Design a protein with these regions (language model features):
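A boundary/linker detector
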Residues: 1-12, 16-17, 21, 117-127
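Rieske [2Fe-2S] iron-sulfur-binding domain
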Residues: 26-127
Length: 127
C-alpha cells in the first residue's frame, strides 16, 4: 500500500484537547464506533468500542488501569480487562478468549488521526 493510500484512509477524529486523562471518548468512523483513551504519559490509544462479551458499545465507559506494564481498559459490563496496545483480553472473567480491534493512532500536532485495524484495510480500499 502506498503512503498516499494510507493518507486517504486516515481520518481526523478529535484534538488532544477534546480528551481527558484516563477518561474514554467514543467516535463514530463510518459505521464503526471507536473508543479513545488519553493516558497520563500523553499517549493516546484507540480500540473498538464494542464489548465482544456483552455486544454493547460501552468500552469507552470502562475503567482505565494497568496490568504489569500494559495499559488496560476494563469493560463496564462484565469487567473483562483488555490490553489497550494489543486488544487482547487479559482477564476473561471465566469466559472464552476475545479481543478488541486496535486502531493505529497518528498525532499531527494536537490532532488525533486514526488508521483502521490492519484487517479492515482491504475492505476500506475496495470501497
Amino acid at each position: 500500500m502506498s503512503i498516499m493510500a494510507v493518507e486517504k484512509i486516515g481520518v481526523r477524529v478529535c484534538s488532544t484537547r477534546d480528551l481527558e486523562v484516563e477518561r474514554g471518548r467514543a467516535a463514530l468512523i463510518g459505521g464503526t464506533q471507536v473508543a479513545l483513551f488519553l493516558l497520563p504519559d500523553g499517549s493516546v490509544h484507540a480500540v473498538s468500542n464494542l464489548d465482544p462479551y456483552s455486544g454493547a458499545h460501552v468500552i469507552s465507559r470502562g475503567m482505565v488501569g494497568t496490568k504489569g506494564d500494559a495499559p488496560t481498559i476494563a469493560s463496564p459490563m462484565y469487567k473483562q480487562v483488555f490490553d489497550l496496545r494489543t486488544g487482547e483480553c487479559l482477564e476473561t472473567q471465566g469466559k472464552g478468549p476475545a479481543e478488541l480491534a486496535v486502531w493505529c493512532v497518528v498525532r499531527r500536532g494536537d490532532d488525533i488521526h486514526l488508521l483502521p485495524p490492519v484487517e479492515s484495510v482491504p475492505e476500506l480500499l475496495a470501497s
